[in-house]
Amino acid sequence: MTEFTHINQQGHAKMVDVSDKQITKRTAVAHSSITVNETIYKQISNNTNTKGNVLNTAQIAGIMAAKNTSTIIPMCHPLPLTGIDVHFSWDETNAPLYTLNIQTTVSTTGKTGVEMEALTAASATALTIYDMTKAVDKGMIIGETYLESKSGGKSGDFQRQSGQ
């Protein structure tokens, strides 16, 4: 029978005890995206959105989300994050639709990984872009959100293969 790590003997939720795990450097990289129309693309690129600088605000939202992951995802450990970075790149190959790729990198030196923090940062970044531009078009599409890579920890390294 499978032993559930987040369920105690009484069948109730619990946070995994990581006291005996080794402290190691851990890094996770996550990806998300949002596809927008040409008007929104131009507003973001030219910094002319009436709500302000969309990318700067979205970066801050992603950083805040990573820092607060344990408050919104049950059983996530609160972690002392040592680095959070949010990068953007446009894919203009399907104009008049434009996809903004979001890559988040989160690091810590600790006893548990930062995959959830990187994924939460990527998600919140995309959601913030949607929120700041929805007055122009509510038809935007938030794309797949996934872990690109992780390093450190007992389970070792992970690198997503293309097509995976």
Curated annotation (Swiss-Prot):
Catalyses which reaction(s): (8S)-3',8-cyclo-7,8-dihydroguanosine 5'-triphosphate = cyclic pyranopterin phosphate + diphosphate
EC number: 4.6.1.17
Molecular function GO terms recorded: cyclic pyranopterin monophosphate synthase activity
SUPFAM superfamilies the UniProt entry points to: Molybdenum cofactor biosynthesis protein C, MoaC
Active site positions, chain numbering: D131
Pfam family, one: MoaC
Residues spanning the signal sequence: none
Keyword field contains Lyase: yes
Domain of life: Bacteria
Gene Ontology annotations of biological process type: Mo-molybdopterin cofactor biosynthetic process
Pathway: Cofactor biosynthesis; molybdopterin biosynthesis
InterPro entries membership: MoaC, MoaC_bact/euk, MoaC_sf, MoCo_biosynth_MoaA/MoaC, Mopterin_CF_biosynth-C_dom
Keywords carried by this UniProt record: Lyase, Molybdenum cofactor biosynthesis
Chain positions recorded as substrate binding sites: M75, C76, H77, M116, E117
HAMAP family: MoaC_B
Family in the record: Belongs to the MoaC family.
UniProt subunit comment: Homohexamer; trimer of dimers.
Role played: Catalyzes the conversion of (8S)-3',8-cyclo-7,8-dihydroguanosine 5'-triphosphate to cyclic pyranopterin monophosphate (cPMP).
PANTHER family xrefs: MOLYBDOPTERIN COFACTOR SYNTHESIS PROTEIN A
Protein name (database record): Cyclic pyranopterin monophosphate synthase
Gene for this chain: moaC
